């Protein structure tokens, strides 16, 4: 039977699918004694492809239900808003389905390893609209998070390079640079993610606009332990160009056992 799962945008201490293993540089050199700054471009690509595949395959160990709020702080002078949001996630065969429902509509993100992400936006009494990746490069419910951010779209881009390993927040991280096949106006030119090598969760990401300027910064802010596993409780996206910022705060609880 289908099992309800709560995948938060960045999974912490997650299980993996059998098909994915941690990148070679982590398995072969866990203390980063050999691989620190990675100069060899072929190694950058190999480690990057392995890392993106592993992160696509991550799943939480147990089901979690979630409600929460978007706390939206617009550029200076604007009125702050709080938007209630409901989260629902379930597995449909090899596909992971994430739904984010606000009053104005529901975003459904369908993701399977190695396949294009499918985005669907449904408003009340309207036929659901299928969005391509470029169309998903738009704000979700007026927040600084784009729909494509919620789908971790950058992990599916063809160009993935691990360029170095360094400490961040006291944890050894791989620095993953993700670039799309082509840069489109209004989209991203690259995303630089600091990935904790233990949990394989993102501890910081910098997202650059089509002109190569820093646009947004993503950071997880708080975690909660449920059934012995850490889950993301709060995360923030701030716009470096406008000064706006959005926090997503999750109210988490274990899902009822099927």
Put a short name on every predicted segment.
Residues 64-70, 98-100, 117-119, 189-191, ...:
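One face of beta-strands
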Residues 4-12:
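Sec-dependent N-terminal signal peptides
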Residues 66, 99-100, 126, 170, ...:
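Buried hydrophobic packing residues in well-ordered domains
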Residues 146-148, 153, 171-258:
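Gly/Pro-enriched, hydrophobic low-complexity segments
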Residues 13-80, 88-94:
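N-terminal leader/targeting segments and the immediate start of mature chains
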Residues 69-75, 101-103, 121-124, 179-181, ...:
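A generic structural motif
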Residues 55, 85-90, 111-112, 219-225:
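Extended lipid/amphipathic-ligand handling interfaces
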Residues 20-26, 37-50, 57, 78, ...:
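Flexible, processing/modification-adjacent segments and terminal tails
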């Amino acid at each position: 039977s289908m099992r309800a799962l709560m995948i938060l945008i960045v999974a912490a201490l997650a299980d993996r699918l059998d098909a994915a293993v941690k990148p070679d540089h982590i398995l072969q050199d866990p203390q980063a004694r050999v691989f620190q700054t990675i100069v060899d471009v072929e190694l950058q690509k190999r480690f990057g492809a392995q890392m993106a595949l592993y992160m696509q395959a991550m799943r939480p160990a147990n089901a979690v239900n979630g409600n929460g709020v978007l706390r939206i702080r617009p550029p200076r002078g604007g009125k702050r808003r709080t938007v209630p949001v409901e989260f629902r996630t379930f597995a449909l065969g090899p596909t992971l389905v994430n739904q984010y429902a606000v009053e104005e509509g529901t975003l459904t993100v369908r993701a399977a390893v190695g396949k294009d992400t499918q985005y669907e936006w449904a408003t009340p009494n309207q036929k659901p609209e299928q969005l391509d990746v470029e169309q998903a490069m738009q704000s979700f419910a007026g927040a600084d998070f784009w729909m494509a951010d919620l789908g971790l779209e950058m992990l599916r881009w063809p160009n993935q390079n691990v360029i170095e390993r360094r400490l961040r927040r006291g944890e050894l991280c791989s620095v993953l640079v993700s670039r799309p096949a082509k840069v489109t106006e209004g989209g991203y030119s690259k995303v630089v993610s600091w990935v904790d090598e233990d949990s394989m969760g993102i501890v910081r990401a910098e997202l650059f606009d089509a002109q190569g300027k820093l646009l947004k910064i993503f950071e997880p802010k708080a975690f909660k332990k449920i059934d012995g596993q850490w889950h993301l409780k709060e995360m923030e996206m701030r716009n470096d160009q406008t000064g706006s910022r959005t926090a997503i705060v999750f109210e988490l609880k274990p899902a009822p056992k099927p």
